[in-house]
Amino acid sequence: MTTLENPEMQAQLLSAALPYMQRYENKHVVVKYGGHAMGNPELGKAFARDVALLKQSGVNPIVVHGGGPQIQAMLTKLGIESRFEGGLRVTDEKTVEVVEMVLAGSINKEIVALINAEGEWAIGLCGKDGNMVFAQKAHKTVIDPDSNIEKVLDLGFVGEPAEVDRTLLDLLARSEMIPVIAPVAPGRDGHTYNINADTFAGAIAGALAATRLLFLTDVPGVLDKDKKLIKELSVADAQALIRDGTISGGMIPKVETCIDAIRRGVEGVVILNGKTPHSVLLELFTEHGAGTLIVP
């Protein structure tokens, strides 16, 4: 008999989790769902069950999802070539139509169906619904390696959140529904914009003054120079680790997004491994958590 099949052990686990469930009761927890976990059916079911359990425990979960690999697969299938500027994808009019179709029309509904299969009421949304999010054109700059001059990149319809209205999300929370949100939003200029899912999740969490924002990634969290997991960091600690090179590469923008979310009013942001089954529950409902917590 395994630990989880032992009734006494099950009771002990539930008892140990109770104080943490009470801590998050009626609190907003935003979960950014992405990475390889999205492509694994078993991990997808485990994630949906975790989200359902959060709702049943009195938490108000909000899911924001990405879908980069699925977008690229559809662009390839349709014969639409991707153009890059400074290593970043340019989103033209044809591409943004595909992005919206894949994110809001396909992936979003798959996640909704998984959560609903666990007995909860999930509803699929994007930034356009209820004027929840308005975007503005993102401005990116790079240093030209030849001239060492800063160059402004035109990435087309790549945006960033400019305005977030929490009215619809509050209404859904009172209605016992779980919002699942695709990072697509309109601009005041009438165009549709594709927004980085991490940035979008941070803006949603900030508008809600969420207790936690969880980033499900393909790594355990922030690692020290000995490649050991750092359990907790202040914003100042995180900035120091970026300066000394401990935090490097693709982890830098992830941590900077965490810092930005905290400045927007989020109480704590966690980077954790979405490939670990039930990592959301391990983070919220156990003593030691499951990733790196960044706090003010």
Curated annotation (Swiss-Prot):
Q: Which GO terms describe its biological process?
A: arginine biosynthetic process via ornithine; L-arginine biosynthetic process
Which parts of the sequence bind substrate? Answer: 67-68, 89, 194
Task: Check the record and name the Pfam families matching this protein.
Answer: AA_kinase
The record, for CDD domains, names: AAK_NAGK-C
UniProt site (Transition state stabilizer): 32, 254
> Where does it mainly reside?
cytoplasm
Reported function: Catalyzes the ATP-dependent phosphorylation of N-acetyl-L-glutamate.
Q: Cite the entry's keywords alphabetically.
A: Amino-acid biosynthesis, Arginine biosynthesis, ATP-binding, Cytoplasm, Kinase, Nucleotide-binding, Transferase
Organism encoding this protein: Brucella canis (strain ATCC 23365 / NCTC 10854 / RM-666)
Q: Has the keyword Transferase been applied to this entry? A: yes
Q: Which reaction does it catalyse?
A: N-acetyl-L-glutamate + ATP = N-acetyl-L-glutamyl 5-phosphate + ADP
InterPro entries this protein is in? AceGlu_kinase-like_sf, AcgluKinase_fam, ArgB, Asp/Glu/Uridylate_kinase, NAGK-C
Instruction: Please provide, alphabetically and separated by semicolons, the GO molecular function terms listed in this UniProt record.
Output: acetylglutamate kinase activity; ATP binding
Task: Please state which protein family the record places this protein in.
Answer: Belongs to the acetylglutamate kinase family. ArgB subfamily.
Stated EC number for the protein is 2.7.2.8
Pathways per UniProt: Amino-acid biosynthesis; L-arginine biosynthesis; N(2)-acetyl-L-ornithine from L-glutamate: step 2/4
This chain's protein is named Acetylglutamate kinase
Which compartment or compartments is the protein found in?
Answer: Cytoplasm
Which GO CC terms are listed, alphabetically? cytoplasm
UniProt xrefs under SUPFAM superfamilies: Carbamate kinase-like
Q: Does the keyword Transferase apply?
A: yes
